[in-house]
From Swiss-Prot:
Gene name in the database record: P4HA1
Regulation of its activity: Inhibited by poly(L-proline).
Effect ascribed to mutating Y210A: Strongly reduced affinity for peptide substrate
Assembly with partners or alone: Heterotetramer of two alpha-1 chains and two beta chains (P4HB)(the beta chain is the multi-functional PDI), where P4HB plays the role of a structural subunit; this tetramer catalyzes the formation of 4-hydroxyproline in collagen.
Family of the protein in this entry: Belongs to the P4HA family.
Molecular function GO terms recorded: identical protein binding; iron ion binding; L-ascorbic acid binding; procollagen-proline 4-dioxygenase activity
Function: Catalyzes the post-translational formation of 4-hydroxyproline in -Xaa-Pro-Gly- sequences in collagens and other proteins.
Organism name: Homo sapiens
Keyword Signal: yes
Places the protein is found: Endoplasmic reticulum lumen
Classification via Gene3D superfamilies: 6.10.140.1460, q2cbj1_9rhob like domain, Tetratricopeptide repeat domain
Name listed for the protein in its UniProt record: Prolyl 4-hydroxylase subunit alpha-1
Residues binding 2-oxoglutarate: K510
Length: 534
């Protein structure tokens, strides 16, 4: 009976080499200008075609009047020598000119421009990446398909709608990934919009074809059968649906016979009371991460909250900050996470972004087994590295970090600038190397990453928080601020509570830059204590 499963097999075209637009909102803005240029070129082409048609129309109207007069008295008309001459001239010369005008291709300029710009277009991987980002945002922020389709997202300035065809394409992307849960959600949304009367290039038969199979793959045979019957009402000759109908009915009959004795056990399971909600502390990391991204589950006792303060910080009497101390705020106690306010100016931010933009490349991670740098699905951003010697602003920023932390930046890594893409994120990770990764920073020769300094260089309309799932902390982006924490205890042991993540950007454009400071050079700046965990 396996031959009955004819149900859908779709392959996306192979992706070509591309710049990975979907991983950086900053670079995606270039596409807006590209499309604007193409629209201008297209309008020029339309104007040229309209001018051409106007000339042909005027010529046709003139000849229509002339031939109407001539056909009333052909002999009398050509008996006039001027008319005879003009008739010869028109047929010998002017009709040839008209033929050339009609055959003239006005699209050359537009096609030429389109061909030039096409090399900068996103490709299949970009489109699929953007689609997956929507699915990721849907899960992380508990958004239903109707909310996304209608563009009702928090903080949006430019509301945008999804057509039934768009919803269908999202469902197809999920299907290609064998993600039948999202396939069902988006095919149902497409079907809903079609049922509401939306005019579309897709039809209900195609949607039901995918939907019935997605439901079947999730084990809901009754619903799959119902949807298949609905499809056959619209297209009784649909070969795959007819095959599936027989297969579903066969499976249901077989299950009914085999599982009769087990039906009582199943009913007992259904009546079993549900377990009480699990405390946030004991949820799997993925759930805690998503809850924190939504601003849920963040709890700190009043006693702990009383230990959090705001203060002016002069960098241990650093001359640069005595008259204008830095504004410091405690974000969390264990691990201690500090935010510095108004610590980088808008002008400095723009210079850093301008330096980074031409160098932005897809962000990578170090493979713990091979040590090779590679792109991964859980880190969606582009990054660039800036050295202090190449621009005085970068050098000044580096020294500011040293003055405020008291740590030596000469052994730190270069300033990393990152711009997050559609649904841009970096799932939970450690900044420091664990004991099973002894060679992680061996080539640097500066030891482990003792601390992290993170600048927020843009406000984010929705999403994009930095969260610490182990402890329940969430730090929200605020332009011009920076956060700082130690990854290692003073003993050099890793602080596993610093495991953190960059939440997906729901709406907006997130720019950050960070400085990873290393152990070497800090021996007397942050000496170890007698305890491993201090």
């Amino acid at each position: 009976m396996i031959w009955y499963i004819l149900i859908i097999g779709i392959l996306l075209p192979q992706s070509l080499a591309h710049p990975g637009f979907f991983t950086s909102i900053g670079q995606m803005t270039d596409l807006i200008h590209t499309e604007k240029d193409l629209v201008t070129s297209l309008k020029d082409y339309i104007k040229a075609e309209e001018d051409k048609l106007e000339q042909i129309k005027k010529w046709a109207e003139k000849l229509d009047r002339l031939t109407s007069t001539a056909t009333k008295d052909p002999e009398g008309f050509v008996g006039h020598p001027v008319n005879a001459f003009k008739l010869m001239k028109r047929l010998n010369t002017e009709w040839s000119e008209l033929e050339n005008l009609v055959l003239k291709d006005m699209s050359d300029g537009f096609i030429s421009n389109l061909t030039i710009q096409r090399q900068y277009f996103p490709n299949d991987e970009d489109q699929v990446g953007a689609a997956k980002a929507l699915l990721r945002l849907q899960d992380t922020y508990n958004l239903d398909t109707d909310t996304i389709s209608k563009g009702n997202l928090p903080g949006v300035k430019h509301k945008s709608f999804l057509t039934a065809e768009d919803c269908f394409e999202l469902g197809k992307v999920a299907y290609t990934e064998a993600d039948y849960y999202h396939t069902e959600l988006w095919m149902e949304q497409a079907l809903r919009q079609l049922d509401e009367g939306e005019i579309s290039t897709i039809d209900k038969v195609s949607v039901l074809d995918y939907l019935s199979y997605a439901v079947y793959q999730q084990g809901d045979l009754d619903k799959a059968l119902l949807l298949t019957k609905k499809l056959l009402e619209l297209d009784p000759e649909h070969q795959r649906a007819n095959g599936n109908l027989k297969y579903f009915e066969y499976i249901m009959a077989k299950e009914k016979d085999v599982n009769k004795s087990a039906s009582d056990d199943q009913s007992d399971q259904k009546t079993t009371p549900k377990k009480k909600g699990v405390a946030v502390d004991y949820l799997p990391e993925r759930q805690k991460y998503e809850m924190l991204c939504r601003g849920e589950g963040i709890k700190m006792t009043p006693r702990r909250q009383k230990k959090l303060f705001c203060r002016y910080h002069d960098g241990n009497r650093n001359p640069k900050f005595i008259l204008a101390p830095a504004k410091q705020e405690d974000e969390w106690d264990k691990p201690r996470i500090i935010r510095f306010h108004d610590i980088i100016s808008d002008a400095e931010i723009e210079i850093v972004k301008d330096l980074a933009k031409p160098r932005l490349r897809r962000a990578t991670i170090s493979n713990p087994i091979t040590g090779d740098l590679e792109t991964v699905h859980y880190r969606i951003s582009k990054s660039a590295w800036l050295s202090g010697y190449e621009n005085p602003v970068v050098s000044r920023i580096n020294m500011r970090i040293q003055d405020l932390t008291g740590l030596d930046v000469s052994t730190a890594e270069e300033l990393q600038v990152a711009n997050y893409g559609v649904g841009g994120q970096y799932e939970p990770h450690f900044d420091f190397a664990r004991k099973d990764e002894p060679d992680a920073f061996k080539e640097l020769g500066t030891g482990n990453r003792i601390a992290t300094w993170l600048f927020y260089m843009s406000d984010v309309s929705a999403g994009g928080a930095t969260v610490f799932p182990e402890v329940g902390a969430s730090v929200w982006p605020k332009k011009g601020t920076a956060v700082f924490w130690y990854n290692l205890f003073a003993s050099g042991e890793g602080d596993y509570s610093t495991r953190h993540a960059a939440c997906p950007v729901l709406v907006g454009n997130k720019w950050v830059s960070n400085k990873w400071l290393h152990e070497r050079g800090q021996e007397f700046r942050r000496p170890c204590t007698l305890s491993e965990l201090e």
